[in-house]
C-alpha cells in the first residue's frame, strides 16, 4: 500500500489483512490485495470473471511437477481420514455430490493446493486471517516441510492460544474457518507448507 493513501477514501479493508483500491471510475476494485507472501495456488478453481472451472496457470506451466505434487493431497487425505473420520466423511460426501472427479486432485477430496514458503528474506510471516472460499463443514490439512535451521513460523490460532511448531514431514489438520496465521520466522532456514483444500467459490 502506497504512503499517503487514506482509509475509506483511496482504499478500504476487505478483511483485517487485505484491502481494495478505489478505481479511476470511483468504484471499489474487484481485486483485494494483501501482505506479500511467497505463495502459489495449484489445482482447480472457478474463474473469477468467467465462472468456468479450469486448472491453474501453474499446473499448465509445470505438468511434471504437478504430477508429483498430487501425492501430497493423497497423503494428507489419508491423515485426515485417520484423524477425524466423521468430518472426513462429510467432506467426501460433499465432493462426491457436488464436484466432478476431474476437478479433484488425484480424484480425492481436495480441489486446490496452496504452496507457501517462509524465510527471513521474504514472506517471513502471515497475518491473522480466515481462509475465504473453504468448505464450511470441512477442515484443511497442511503438509509441513523444513529446510535448514530456523525458529518461529508457528501456525497460530489466537482464539485458542495455540501455536504449533510443526516438525519436518508432518501433517496438521485444522479448521481454516477459524482465525489463524504464521508467526515471524527467524534463522537461515526455510519452512514450506502445502495446503490441500476444497475451494467452493
Label for each model-derived stretch:
Residues 41-43, 156, 173-174:
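A structural signal for short, well-ordered beta-strand segments and their strand-loop junctions
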Residues 137-146, 170-173:
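Contiguous, well-ordered alpha-helical segments that form the cores/surfaces of helical PPI scaffolds
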Residues 145-167:
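A short beta-strand-loop-beta hairpin characteristic of the jelly-roll/cupin
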Residues 158, 177-180, 185, 193:
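Catalytic or ion-translocation cores adjacent to nucleophile or general acid/base/metal-coordination motifs
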Residues 1-141, 164, 186-201:
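Fe(II)/2-oxoglutarate oxygenase catalytic core
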Residues 164-179:
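Conserved metal-binding segment of the jelly-roll/cupin
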Residues 116-123, 143, 154, 175-181:
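Conserved short secondary-structure elements within globular domains
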Amino acid at each position: 500500500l502506497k504512503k499517503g493513501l487514506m482509509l475509506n477514501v483511496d482504499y478500504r479493508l476487505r478483511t483485517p489483512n487485505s484491502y481494495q483500491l478505489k478505481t479511476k471510475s470511483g468504484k471499489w476494485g474487484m481485486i483485494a490485495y494483501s501482505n506479500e507472501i511467497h505463495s502459489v495456488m495449484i489445482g482447480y478453481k472457478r474463474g473469477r470473471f468467467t465462472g468456468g472451472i479450469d486448472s491453474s496457470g501453474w499446473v499448465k506451466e509445470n505438468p511434471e511437477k504437478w504430477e508429483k505434487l498430487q501425492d501430497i493431497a493423497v497423503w494428507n487425505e489419508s491423515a485426515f481420514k485417520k484423524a477425524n473420520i466423521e468430518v472426513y466423511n462429510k467432506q467426501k460426501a460433499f465432493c462426491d455430490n457436488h464436484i466432478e472427479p476431474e476437478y479433484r486432485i488425484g480424484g480425492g477430496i481436495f480441489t486446490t493446493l496452496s504452496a507457501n514458503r517462509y524465510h527471513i528474506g521474504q514472506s517471513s510471516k502471515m497475518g491473522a486471517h480466515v481462509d475465504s472460499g473453504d468448505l464450511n463443514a470441512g477442515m484443511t490439512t497442511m503438509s509441513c516441510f523444513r529446510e535448514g535451521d530456523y525458529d518461529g513460523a508457528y501456525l497460530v490460532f489466537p482464539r485458542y492460544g495455540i501455536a504449533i511448531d510443526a516438525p519436518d514431514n508432518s501433517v496438521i489438520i485444522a479448521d481454516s474457518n477459524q482465525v489463524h496465521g504464521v508467526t515471524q520466522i527467524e534463522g537461515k532456514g526455510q519452512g514450506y507448507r502445502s495446503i490441500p483444500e476444497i475451494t467452493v467459490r
